[in-house]
Amino acid sequence: MRILTLPASFLLAFLLYLPFPSVVMLRDRALCALHARIVRLFTGKKGRADEKAALAFFLLALSGCAALIGAIHPLCAAVICAPVFSAPACLSLSASVKRTLDSGAFADNFSDYEAQVRETCADFAPAFVTGACAPMVLLAIGTPLYLGSALAWAYAGLCACAACCPAARRISEAISRAAESLFVVLLVLCCGAVGRNPLRTDGKGARSRLLSILGIADGEARTHAPVSGDIVQAAFLCCFCMVLLAVLLSLVLLPLV
């Protein structure tokens, strides 16, 4: 049953974050508060904190608790890993943006309308890189060793503390860069789902590649002016990529678990 942990946790994330997108902020706030308390424990008499030791202890405590809960049962692992997949939260936020655009709020300023569409579509890329692609790969890597929950939550802790801890920022950015490269490959493979030829798209990063696939990037790849329907296409394409990745990782894990 451990093979079902990855797809089940991703599905549960949709059930959690679609109706309650603000849970992402609550999760990150709680992780930052926990990290701050641990930093105080590692603060010496001179007022200097050993940030690296504090970060190591924070990650060990966080991943250790996740690993213990996940080892109870695969269903427990799926439940405990669901909050790590924060990407579905951006779907609710983008839906509210689309409703605003469709209401005619930008009827008098079409340039702002286009900028809002382009920005909303581009924001899907980092959200799915850090909130779906990276934790999904880490969960898959750790699953054969019963460390999937630990690695996924360790990454969530690193991302939450990146703003206040330089070491956490460096590690999380390194993981995110690798995940972004994988996500770009998935976008190219799946761009046919929105009727685009992969050979006619460009862009170095995930944001520019996504806009190019949608046909709303600046340059030769642009096929039309940005409209609110592009937000739906961007959401569908990103979700399609993650479903494909979940299937591929599950097939890879099949002989290992």
Language-model segment annotations:
Residues 1-257:
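Hydrophobic N-terminal alpha-helices or hydrophobic patches in metabolic proteins across all domains
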